[in-house]
């Protein structure tokens, strides 16, 4: 056993010696790394684009009996508030069919811009102030305040401010089910679509729209009448996306002639749900379920 151990030890020592000789004869390879170079990179900020839906769309001509006739009446004034704190009120800044406004960024920051449009409408069949904010074009959105019954007229103002054609899918949700329609919009095209051409005598409806690839501007114009008397006009932008919690800021009505405010709720899901409404007034709090 001692002899065998000595033989194994001798072989191991010889192998170690030979490995040292081979290692010593191998060329030495050195690795070098490039010295890092610091460079300043400037990122061009994306411009902020807003779109104003434009002036009042009159359906059926001034008399209301001209089939298929839709005219944009007058001009809507545009007011801008810049991120620098400057308010721009230019009497020459108006639009009829809609306008795209762009705020170019600076110092790697997107420019800030807030824009509204307003128009006083005075026609035989329409009277009132039509005003709204100007929003960013969107790929999809909701409206839940639609009305298309007797004495109520709703017109969709569709605009494609992009450089590509798109297909807009409209889904009207009425108490009896769903009604769909598709509208093709070329680049830069604006179209006024009377809702009465799609649905008929629906006092309450919701609308979901979605495009095939580029964002568009959609606004809902409403006109109300009582017999031969006009009751007012309105212009609305898409509602906020469905959420668990929503906050609606209060209003102070300082003039007679307005109808009482109505809260409209819409459950877009397939399961029933319960809504808890907390109304806060100056002197009390009311909770409804």
Where are these regions (language model features)?
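Conserved functional hotspot residues at active sites or interaction interfaces
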Residues: 2-64, 115-159, 216-268
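Extracytoplasmic/periplasmic/luminal assembly and interaction segments
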Residues: 56-98
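Short beta-strand/loop motifs in extracellular/secreted proteins, especially
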Residues: 63, 74-77, 154, 164-169, ...
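Intrinsically disordered, low-complexity Pro/Gly/Ser/Thr-rich segments with frequent PxxP/GP/PP motifs
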Residues: 80-100, 175-206, 282-289
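Helix-biased "structured C-terminal domain" signature
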Residues: 86-98, 192, 235-237, 247-249, ...
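Short, aromatic- and glycine-rich surface loops/edge beta-strands on solvent-exposed regions
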Residues: 98-118, 203-213
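Short acidic, flexible loop segments centered on an aromatic residue
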Residues: 155-179, 265-286
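Short, surface-exposed polybasic-aromatic patches that bind anionic ligands, especially phosphate groups
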Residues: 182, 194-197, 201-203, 207-208, ...
